[in-house]
Amino acid sequence: MAFLDQHPGLGFPAAAGLGLLIGSFLNVVILRLPKRMEWQWRRDAREILELPDIYEPPPPGIVVEPSHDPVTGDKLKWWENIPLFSWLMLRGKSRYSGKPISIQYPLVELLTSILCVASVWRFGFGWQGFGAIVLSCFLVAMSGIDLRHKLLPDQLTLPLMWLGLVGSMDNLYMPAKPALLGAAVGYVSLWTVWWLFKQLTGKEGMGHGDFKLLAALGAWCGLKGILPIILISSLVGAVLGSIWLFAKGRDRATPIPFGPYLAIAGWVVFFWGNDLVDGYLRFAGLR
């Protein structure tokens, strides 16, 4: 770690390359985890309802199963799995079917690479930098899944929360107390908004996964990060959500996933939360 800190000319390219590899794996998580969950839900539903057991082959696993063409099912060659560059070499089209390859693949890989470089630039090549990479990767995966399926899996939100709490036990970013309070207040704050909205309208304004994601971000950003995360995510959500509705020609009743906006706000607050608070206090004349 010290070697990379002393030689950033090697460390930053290494972080960028690592980010591309992780981004390729995150694409697999984004595509396959919801399918595995839906398959398990159907099995559980048949068991609970005491319906006849119907054999349904499980979807491809996340780690073991090799990558394949999403249209034809052909196993990909090794060079077709090279992150980002394979998409460029294939000019965004499948070699087997000729159909376009989703822009999601290179975007997720490139974004993850940029976030990994930003993590080590901000926190260095030690454990803090590693933790920032872990947080960034979880947020990318959850945002991708929420955008596609309007779902924030417990398989991602809860481990992220526990990782933040475990890190606080070693005072990685903060002591344990503000991390615990951040997780608790993060969950309760959005749950309260959800409950009040449901009482007033009879509708659910957000999913329970949003509560858990904010709890996870509270474990990483601490209690003082909750309010900035809520404010930033609400602002970003209002602006980008309105643009998306206008571009798609949808009405205001169309549900919009809130997870990506929480992820953006949480990432910003985690990286620059103290600077944001200090800047606001100086602007308000309170410091």
Curated annotation (Swiss-Prot):
This is Prepilin leader peptidase/N-methyltransferase. GO terms for biological process: methylation; signal peptide processing. It catalyses: Typically cleaves a -Gly-|-Phe- bond to release an N-terminal, basic peptide of 5-8 residues from type IV prepilin, and then N-methylates the new N-terminal amino group, the methyl donor being S-adenosyl-L-methionine. The keyword Protease applies. Its EC number is 3.4.23.43, 2.1.1.-. It holds the Pfam family Peptidase_A24. Gene3D superfamilies: 1.20.120.1220. It comes from Xanthomonas campestris pv. campestris (strain ATCC 33913 / DSM 3586 / NCPPB 528 / LMG 568 / P 25).
